[in-house]
């Protein structure tokens, strides 16, 4: 072998060795894409690990916060255990962000207003879409997924988006973000799927055709669910519910048919029975701090106890996660705002510390603390007559455990023997603090009665946990 050839081969083997030792390439965010679990009930990461969706509603993040403010908000949500941020790409048409950059040319969403370069210090380079790029990447660095709403329902309903424009716009979005692993597409936007149906179908179909690896869902109007229109559509990976913001006695509109009131678990239970099997989630229950019923600011406001109730009710009924929202945060209420919606009287910088925001992580941590993909809702566990509304007990179980949630702290009885073993370990889990207190072992036969800590009242909520010994 001549000396020259030896040097070439040595260099080649050296290069191959280095490449072999290098870690597998990841996306710029270092995050794994999400996919459905094998049983189609839950989400998981690409390597098969459970993913419990704990969302926060940051609808106007893109067009109301600058780069520094976005970092403050996203970092706070990361620290509080959230892993999904729900964001509108286009809230209105036309649309511009805090830097004054327009999203589109004129009012045509099929013509995104883009410029060469993306230097943030150069206003001629840093366009609307560069700002969204930054938000997506920043979220990814913090381990957060972005559930992006391409265009909100109101401008579509008003006729500002044609089916052809929707198709072109969706293709632009799909091709721009299909290599970002921390994206979830949230078609729709507080609207019935039957309203402008062709627009929503074109968006869903085009996203799927050009971006086959990201999950797609549909955000419906209040007191409805995506399954009413799109359950059988190939582009819809999982269902989404907006249980809404009304009290029981406020849910009387003749335009609605379900009238579940505050019983958001009923939407989840209905989706759970559908075929083909698809995961489901309540992605917009009542927001903490918003007036009950939304529009009359003299009404009482929903509290942290209420958002806990919606969370545990829906998850124990079979949902794969839960989305929290706070009135001032969802609209990013700033001191510069000339007006606010729904009686928001607090700046977002303060409202991010609402009590419920810190409590939601306890739900996620609880569900991830036991076997995950085998969990099912099971109301046959509840042996005493099912009470209605706030007194209802929601129960769920896995292979080796049972959980039952009470919002009022009332006594209740469970049918034993649903998991293996002669005895079970019994504990009370506090949704306010995330603390678990073991209180004994009990026989795993017959019916057993349980008395939660404290007095019976709304908001004295507890989770009973029974584990196989």
For the regions a language model picked out, list residue spans one by one.
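Bacterial N-terminal signal peptides that target proteins for export
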Residues: 1-9
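C-terminal motif of bacterial Sec signal peptides marking the signal peptidase cleavage site
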Residues: 19-20
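Active-site mouth of glycoside hydrolases
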Residues: 28-250, 254-263
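Aromatic- and carboxylate-lined catalytic core of secreted/periplasmic carbohydrate-active enzymes
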Residues: 49, 269, 276-280, 287-291, ...
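A short, sequence-level motif marking secondary-structure junctions
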Residues: 55-59, 419-420, 443-445
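Short beta-strand segments
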Residues: 186-188, 217-220, 240, 281-284, ...
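Active-site clefts of carbohydrate-active enzymes
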Residues: 244-257, 264-305
């Amino acid at each position: 072998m001549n000396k020259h050839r030896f040097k070439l081969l040595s260099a080649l083997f050296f290069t191959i060795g280095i490449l072999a030792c290098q870690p597998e390439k990841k996306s710029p965010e270092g995050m794994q894409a999400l996919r459905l679990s094998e049983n189609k009930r839950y989400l998981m990461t690409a390597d098969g690990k459970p993913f419990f969706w704990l969302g926060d509603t940051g609808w106007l993040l893109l067009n109301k916060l600058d780069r520094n403010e976005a970092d403050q908000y996203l970092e706070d949500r990361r620290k509080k255990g959230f892993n999904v941020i729900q964001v509108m790409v286009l809230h209105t048409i036309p649309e511009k962000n805090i830097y004054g950059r327009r999203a589109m040319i004129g009012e045509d969403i099929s013509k995104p207003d883009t410029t060469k370069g993306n230097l943030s210090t150069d206003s001629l380079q840093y366009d609307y879409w560069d700002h969204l790029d930054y938000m997506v990447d920043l979220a990814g660095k913090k381990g957060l997924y972005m559930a992006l709403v391409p265009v909100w329902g109101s401008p579509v309903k008003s006729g500002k988006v044609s089916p052809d424009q929707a198709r072109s716009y969706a293709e632009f979005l799909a091709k721009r973000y299909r290599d970002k692993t921390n994206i979830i597409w949230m078609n729709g936007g507080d609207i019935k799927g039957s309203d402008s149906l062709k627009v929503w179908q074109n968006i869903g179909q085009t996203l799927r055709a050009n971006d086959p690896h990201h999950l797609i869902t549909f955000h419906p109007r209040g007191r409805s669910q995506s399954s009413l229109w799109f359950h059988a559509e190939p582009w819809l990976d999982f269902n989404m519910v907006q249980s809404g913001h009304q009290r029981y006695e406020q849910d009387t509109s003749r335009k609605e048919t379900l009238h579940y009131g505050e019983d958001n678990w009923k939407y989840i239970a209905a989706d759970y029975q559908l075929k083909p099997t698809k995961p489901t989630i309540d992605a917009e229950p009542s927001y903490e701090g918003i007036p009950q019923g939304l529009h009359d600011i003299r009404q009482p406001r929903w509290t942290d106890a209420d958002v806990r109730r919606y969370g545990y009710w829906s998850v124990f009924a079979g949902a794969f996660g839960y989305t929290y929202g706070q009135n001032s945060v969802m609209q990013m209420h700033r001191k510069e705002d000339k007006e606010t919606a729904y009686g928001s009287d607090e700046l977002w910088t303060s409202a991010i510390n609402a009590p419920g925001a810190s409590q939601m992580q306890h739900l996620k941590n609880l569900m991830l603390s036991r076997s995950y993909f085998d969990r099912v809702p099971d109301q046959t566990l509840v042996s005493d007559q099912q009470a209605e509304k706030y007194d209802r007990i929601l129960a769920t179980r896995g292979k080796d455990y049972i959980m039952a949630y009470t919002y009022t702290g009332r006594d209740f009885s469970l049918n034993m023997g649903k998991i293996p073993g002669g005895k079970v370990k019994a504990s009370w889990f506090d949704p306010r603090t995330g603390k678990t207190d073991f209180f004994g072992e009990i026989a795993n036969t017959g019916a057993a009665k349980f008395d939660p800590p404290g007095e019976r009242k709304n908001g004295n909520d507890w989770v009973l946990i029974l584990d196989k010994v």
